[in-house]
Swiss-Prot record:
Keywords: Cell cycle, Cell division, Cell membrane, Cell shape, Cell wall biogenesis/degradation, Glycosyltransferase, Membrane, Peptidoglycan synthesis, Transferase. Pathway: Cell wall biogenesis; peptidoglycan biosynthesis. UDP-N-acetyl-alpha-D-glucosamine binds at R166, S196, Q290. One of its GO terms (cellular component) is plasma membrane. This is UDP-N-acetylglucosamine--N-acetylmuramyl-(pentapeptide) pyrophosphoryl-undecaprenol N-acetylglucosamine transferase. Disulfide bonds: none annotated.
Amino acid sequence: MSKIAFTGGGTVGHVSVNLSLIPTATDKGHDAFYIGSKTGIEREMIESQLPNIEYYPISSGKLRRYLSVDNAKDVFKVLKGVIDARKVLKREKPDLLFSKGGFVSVPVVIAARSLNIPTIIHESDLTPGLANKISLKFAKKIYTTFEDTLKYLPKDKADFVGATIRQDLKEGNQSRGYQLTGFDASKKVLLVMGGSLGSKKLNQAIRENLEALLQDYQIIHLTGHGLVDSSIDAKGYVQYEFVKEELTDLLAITDTVVSRAGSNAIYEFLTLRIPMLLIPLGLDQSRGDQIDNAENFESKGYGRTIPEDQLTQVKLLEQLKEIENDRESIIKQMETYRESYTKEDLFNKILKDAL
């Protein structure tokens, strides 16, 4: 049996694949542990959802594509992170490292290379992120969720594996979903997700359109931390900052979703055949990865996209109406998608490629 180190963090998307793979590893008798940041969302998710997995916090700095005084400070944080990670890896002596990306992963990958620990990295977005571009220099292989991502990567290192979906995602219970929300099973449900950090602009657009939206939908609104508006008390509208294990039950009653365009989330909607209206993060807040993801999904007929700078009350209602009119054809397109690798297949491939 092998011992496997996992890393990745900063957003839910940089943790979700690990959350799927770690139980697969331990169920097969392998040992696993996690290296992440001290205060990132990965720590909360791993410690709450996988309490038996040892979590090692390290120093980490943010990687920026623009000039900033903070870049100089963060160089030292990254170097400290390499030292922290190296100490953990020397003590735990894993056989391999699996990295999901995010800024915290870079010092861990560098530390693993310094100890000759083979590393496999995973890229969920259509275009590779900065952390994975750096990590690739020190890794043995990189796996991609989108097949089109291969054109950005060296052929000898890159493999397309598709999306790896949590098994419990498909085990949501409609009865529990309706019980949680108090909704009527005879009326459609719209789920609004602004990403792990929430979206003030998306929240505002939903609330400004609430009266019109509630004519056609009951609404589950995942607002993001600290963004619930307690002054709103409308029948058929519920708000949560963030949900964990309840999400599968809420998705089980969802007819349409309005969401950011992080790849893990949108592949989950695709797997569940939920038509989607995607509002990707703009270039003022990101490198444009969500824009690429959203455009790719729209081109395949899985839903519609509104660029955030074009999000208006009128546009939101228009696009949702289009989705309702085209619901059958959207779901038909979604049904042509087939999962490439199960989590068991992916785990076996990791072992084969790394060891």
